[in-house]
Amino acid sequence: MRQTKTGILLANLGTPDAPTPEAVKRYLKQFLSDRRVVDTSRLLWWPLLRGVILPLRSPRVAKLYASVWMEGGSPLMVYSRQQQQALAQRLPETPVALGMSYGSPSLESAVDELLAEHVDHIVVLPLYPQYSCSTVGAVWDELARILARKRSIPGISFIRDYADNHDYINALANSVRASFAKHGEPDLLLLSYHGIPQRYADEGDDYPQHCRTTTRELASALEMAPEKVMMTFQSRFGREPWLMPYTDETLKMLGEKGVGHIQVMCPGFAADCLETLEEIAEQNREVFLGAGGKKYEYIPALNATPEHIEMMANLVAAYR
């Protein structure tokens, strides 16, 4: 029987190529054109996107990217490349490619890279622990479009989510413990997840359940009382209701109520990016301290830590 050669495709959202209005505009146009992300009628959405959102948001968002840009590129790209390289070192016999839903490197370039290595089976690992149609679903859609153009397609194993994976929860717990040891145990551990429109959940997206699962399992691993762990949702966009409670409003309320010390972790982000390093670590710090809070720390994403890479290796092992 012929031996199967397996490759691994790490997938994430994507990032602009540069912290400039032009690069951000290109990225946002591709991102916000995906029906998985914004499903508004195209007749209504296109004029709003092209005539209002892109011209107004691109310069402002470019400045935010510039504030966190690293020598090797955006934080998401730097940490994603580190993850790819570390996993390849951990699994030296297995090709590992990196692809983004939007921007570069594309998912198509990642598939082609693996096919050039003569793999006949690809394990796709979207680096979103909690499934959502707007993230994991977008990877699935693009992968299907890519393979529809191939005469010969490889076998595909697609990891839908890993919200309660034992290694993932332990890696998060150890990261929290290290932060507590460094800064002292806070009055409250706030777990902030990227939000989605409430309507998506109402229509069947089980993302909120996955977030609750991760929150419950992490609190259990840390042996923390339920009242000392809170789950919120960040990064809302547009006017329709998103999952609640909102992170920024919650931090303001907690500061006003006299909560003195908070530490914030974003368990849904496998790599630090604009939404964690600027929105959570900077903007929301100001919100909390400005409302009367005394001490605020952001706990970094797992990024390319050895525990995170080992988790990835163990996760894909079941599909190789």
Curated annotation (Swiss-Prot):
GO terms for molecular function: ferrochelatase activity; metal ion binding. One of its GO terms (biological process) is heme biosynthetic process. It is found in: Cytoplasm. Pathway: Porphyrin-containing compound metabolism; protoheme biosynthesis; protoheme from protoporphyrin-IX: step 1/1. Its EC number is 4.98.1.1. It catalyses: heme b + 2 H(+) = protoporphyrin IX + Fe(2+). It comes from the Bacteria. Disulfide bonds: none annotated. SUPFAM superfamilies: Chelatase. Keywords: Cytoplasm, Heme biosynthesis, Iron, Lyase, Metal-binding, Porphyrin biosynthesis. GO terms for cellular component: cytoplasm. InterPro entries: Ferrochelatase (IPR001015), Ferrochelatase_AS (IPR019772), Ferrochelatase_C (IPR033644), Ferrochelatase_N (IPR033659). Gene3D superfamilies: 3.40.50.1400. The keyword Metal-binding applies. The keyword Cytoplasm applies. Catalyzes the ferrous insertion into protoporphyrin IX. Belongs to the ferrochelatase family. This is Ferrochelatase. It comes from Escherichia coli (strain SMS-3-5 / SECEC).
